[in-house]
């Protein structure tokens, strides 16, 4: 697999997840696996949060937002990535937003649907989930990273274009850059290399913000994307 990343991006990603206190072995227990839901103009979305065991009083942990690919949900994505095991060992929280099958029959994030605004509506719901987790859990808001697979990777990149100041790092695994599609048909074309880049809606604050480092992971024999 080809990994397209600079050394500085990799170092920045590791730094954003590094605990502020000395790392210690996690106490016995598997941690907490908690459900949640947010509602907004684009409807409602469920999510899951993993919290490692033994969080001390006043301790703040980094947060990693994980966006699944098509046909997945929080449970299957957590199981396939084993991110909760890593979070327990390295001591950080994990947020898994879930796409609703009523919003997309294949369970894909609608990152491409910028023409009708569905992409931006879903991005807003994911940010609501991030904000809710920050309120209810001991999150270090200065150390939040986001990662996604396939459609989740594209949505992660879209989210960062709208809120670059909220994230310390972004990881795209087998995704398509946002702005290369505006409908289901053009998204399918973009997956096979037929891409016409168009400007994305953003805000002056986003344009002036410091952009987080990007790590791109993509197989050179990928026949899907």
Where do the language-model regions lie?
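A domain-start/cap signature at the N-terminus of enzymes
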Residues: 1-63, 75-81, 89, 93, ...
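Structural cue for short, hydrophobic secondary-structure segments
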Residues: 66-69, 96
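Serine-hydrolase catalytic-loop signature spanning alpha/beta hydrolases and amidase-signature enzymes
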Residues: 71-73
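Alpha/beta-hydrolase active-site loop
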Residues: 115-137, 158
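Primarily recognizes the serine-hydrolase "nucleophile elbow" in alpha/beta-hydrolase
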Residues: 134-136, 141-206
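Short, proline-enriched alpha-helix->beta-strand connector loops that line the catalytic pocket
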Residues: 208-214
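Short beta-strand/loop motif that positions the catalytic acidic residue
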Residues: 216-218, 222
């Amino acid at each position: 697999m080809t990994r397209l990343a600079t050394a500085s991006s990799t170092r920045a990603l590791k730094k954003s997840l590094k605990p502020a206190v000395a790392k210690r072995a996690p106490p016995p227990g598997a941690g907490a696996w908690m459900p949640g839901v947010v509602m907004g103009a684009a409807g409602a979305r469920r999510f899951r949060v993993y919290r490692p065991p033994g969080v001390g009083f006043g301790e703040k942990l980094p947060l990693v937002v994980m966006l699944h690919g098509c046909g997945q949900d929080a449970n299957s994505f957590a199981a396939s990535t084993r991110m909760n095991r890593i979070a327990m060992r390295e001591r950080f929280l994990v947020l898994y937003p879930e796409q609703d099958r009523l919003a997309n029959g294949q369970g894909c994030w609608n990152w491409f649907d910028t023409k009708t605004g569905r992409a931006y509506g879903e991005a807003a719901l994911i940010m609501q989930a991030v904000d809710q987790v920050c309120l209810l859990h001991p999150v270090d808001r200065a150390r939040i990273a986001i990662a996604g697979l396939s459609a989740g990777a594209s949505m992660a990149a879209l989210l960062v274009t709208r809120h670059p100041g909220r994230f310390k790092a972004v990881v795209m695994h087998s995704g398509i850059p946002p702005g290369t599609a505006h409908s289901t048909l053009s998204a399918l074309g973009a997956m096979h290399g037929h891409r016409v880049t168009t400007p994305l809606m953003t805000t002056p604050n986003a344009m002036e913000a410091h952009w987080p480092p990007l790590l791109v992971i993509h197989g050179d024999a990928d026949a899907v994307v």
